[in-house]
Amino acid sequence: MQLQLLKESGQREVFCGLTSIVWLHRRMPDAFFLVVGSRTCAHLIQSAAGVMIFAEPRFGTAILGERDLAGLADANEELDRVVADLLQRRPEIRTLFLVGSCPSEVIKLDLSKAAERLNQQHRGRVQVVNYSGSGIETTFTQGEDQALTALVPLMPQSTTPQLLLVGTLADGVEERFLTLFERLGIGPVASLPPRRSTELPAVGPGTKLLLTQPFLGQTARALQAKGAELISSPYPLGVEGSELWFRAAARAFGISDEHTTSVLEPLVTRGRAALEPHRKALEGKRLFLLPDSQMELALGRFLQRECGMELVEVGTPYLDRALQQEELDLLPADVQLSEGQNVEEQLQRVRQSHPDLVVCGMGLANPLEAEGITTKWSIELVFSPIHGCDQAGDLAELFARPLRRRGALTFA
């Protein structure tokens, strides 16, 4: 099927990859994320995480001052001092992520060499890795992709058959998924990222990859380079996507369709029942998805096929066909897709099309609301447990809620 694809470039309106630290630091409590950046970087992460500094969270910022940016001070020397002080204060840290930012990249601070140097200085005490969270060329979810890619070289090699779930899931969702895989007869099952940064799963020719998020292309390719095999499937958002996701894994491990159906059928029935009250609020409503997270195709598929919404346009920051083809195949043939962003032109199309709901970044939401256009923050979908059949009702409610709010505030 040939879908209409509009490629755009121009001014963008997205968060940077530093935002992903908010969910990654919760996933790996023995890791610390040290951003090498400006005060703006520090304010962004602290505000996004909703954590006060005196609570000693597992992230922080080594702030580049004016002398650093002007090249009048040795930023590497200062970074070494900051890391030494941090490790002395926080002896529980086992993995230290040095996270690049727009300012550190502008002054060409080589954090890969810094990581090598710090590994030598603190050998046996902590593992130091680095990745870029800069938003110069990427969107916010790609921060996780960069972080996981940085861990791949540290993963031991193995030829043992296993399933590897790639991408951060809420703990409760992951537990339910592991239980379902056990009932299906699939195992062992490992996760990347792991709950402890020092307990990285092995990977090799016997490993089959199942992605939980569509924005992990770089990680998937790094794992494939180590011999792993990617299982292609839609993503586990909504009842349909979750069922197809589990069925793809079952087929890859030789599980019969009959057994898979017997395990999944109760969940599918329960998930569809949970969807029904929200479907009534969403059915027939017109939806415009602005590019922000790379989750837009999966969300559009869910909202159109399971909730009855009409897709005006589905935008994505980057269309990775190797990871998104299964989602593309489930979208209507006449849907308008856009890749990349020219924010002024896209906002003009929003105004002209008069959608009932726009899914967009926080920076665009308030201006659109002021124009009378109902919006949903796309970043909330990354922070919320939305994966799996059991969460399908909650996922639909996230979109029904702003429509109900708008209805409650409308006066005759």
From Swiss-Prot:
Record flagged with keyword Metal-binding: yes
Pathway connected to this protein: Porphyrin-containing compound metabolism; chlorophyll biosynthesis (light-independent)
Gene Ontology molecular function: 4 iron, 4 sulfur cluster binding; ATP binding; metal ion binding; oxidoreductase activity, acting on iron-sulfur proteins as donors; oxidoreductase activity, acting on the CH-CH group of donors, iron-sulfur protein as acceptor
Enzyme class (EC, first level): oxidoreductase
Record keywords, A-Z: 4Fe-4S, ATP-binding, Chlorophyll biosynthesis, Iron, Iron-sulfur, Metal-binding, Nucleotide-binding, Oxidoreductase, Photosynthesis
GO terms under biological process: light-independent chlorophyll biosynthetic process; photosynthesis, dark reaction
Residues involved in [4Fe-4S] cluster binding: 16, 41, 102
Full protein name: Light-independent protochlorophyllide reductase subunit N
Organism of this sequence: Synechococcus sp. (strain RCC307)
